[in-house]
Curated annotation (Swiss-Prot):
Protein name, per record: Uncharacterized protein aq_377
Superkingdom of the organism of origin: Bacteria
Matches recorded under NCBIfam families: cas_csx3
InterPro entries registered for this protein in UniProt: CRISPR-assoc_prot_Crn3/Csx3
Source organism (scientific name): Aquifex aeolicus (strain VF5)
Pfam families xrefs: Cas_csx3 (PF09620)
Similarity section: To A.fulgidus AF1864.
CDD domains: Csx3_III-U
Organism classification: Bacteria, Pseudomonadati, Aquificota, Aquificia, Aquificales
Length: 111
C-alpha cells in the first residue's frame, strides 16, 4: 500500500493510500470532537483533482455517523464506497457504480 496524499483541514487529518489499482483507502483522524457546524469546514481530499475518482473508496476512521453520511455523499461520483470494519478485516461496500462489486460485498486486502 503506498501513500499518495497527506493533508489536513481545520478539524480533520486525512491520509490517502492506494490499496491496489482499483481501491483507495481514505483514513481520517479528528483533531477534536466535532459539532454539526464543522461539516461546513471539512475539506476531504478531492478524488477528481487527486486522480483517484476511478477507484473504489474505502473510508476508515472514528467519527460520528453524520460525518460518514457527509463523506459517502462527497465521494458518490467515484466507482463506489466501502466502510472499513476491523471485525471483518475489510470494507463493506455501501455504494457501487460497478458490476464487479455490489452493495454488501466485503473488500479485503493484505497489509
Amino acid at each position: 500500500m503506498n501513500e499518495i496524499l497527506k493533508t489536513e483541514d481545520e478539524v480533520v487529518r486525512w491520509s490517502v493510500k492506494k490499496i491496489n489499482d482499483d481501491t483507495t483507502l481514505i483514513e481520517f483522524e479528528l483533531k477534536r470532537d466535532l459539532v454539526p457546524e464543522d461539516l461546513k469546514k471539512i475539506n476531504p481530499p478531492d478524488a477528481v483533482k487527486n486522480k483517484f475518482a476511478n477507484t473504489f473508496i474505502v473510508l476508515s476512521g472514528r467519527g460520528p455517523i453524520w460525518l460518514y453520511g457527509f463523506l459517502i455523499h462527497f465521494y458518490h461520483p467515484t466507482k463506489g464506497i466501502g466502510v472499513f470494519d476491523p471485525r471483518l478485516g475489510g470494507a463493506v461496500v455501501v455504494s457501487s457504480h460497478s458490476p464487479n462489486k455490489k452493495v454488501g460485498d466485503v473488500i479485503k486486502w493484505e497489509g
